Amino acid sequence: DATAWDHAAAMLDEIEEIVAAHGMSQAIHPHLGTMIERPSDVKNVLERSQVGWTFDMGHLMIGGYDPVEFLADARDRIAHVHLKDVRLDLAAPVLRGEQSIMQGVQNGMFCPMGDGDVPVAEVVSELERSGYDGWYVLEQDAAITDGEPAPGEGPKVDVLRSIEYLRAINAEFTAGQKAS
């Protein structure tokens, strides 16, 4: 309810004052399975507090908030970015309560950059055009359940594919900047 959101936002702002006094800042991280998951949750915090945000593309998308829309709504509040792609078809059973988040991860819900439904290239390009100069963190969720993967297998493969994709985005963006 509104009273609970007002209280949560007031606490976030109070925490922000405390950390700012020590030369730090905080960033709220929207995440599947938490209090701040769906667009209405995110907007409740955006409207009621001044807290910074971890722009987690994958978790925003899985919660139903288009990352491009979030960027338009909260660009000036982004503290850092989690680069994360998601396949919404594999997230659907998790959202319906038919699978746990861990089962969704095991099934490949969070995939290498460019293999999912997040408009990664569009979002990164817009962040760069808008002058974002903070951290980008490549976040690749993996669920290793049967011991250590063989060399050249496991999450390393997905991370390398994501890096390759991000390099391609960077090359396109850089070429576009030089042409302008």
Regions of interest found by a model, annotated:
Residues A20-S25, R48-V51, R77-A79, S130-W135, ...:
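Short, well-ordered coil/turn segments that N-cap beta-strands
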Residues E14-S25, A121-D133, A168-G176:
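A structural motif corresponding to the C-terminal end of an alpha-helix
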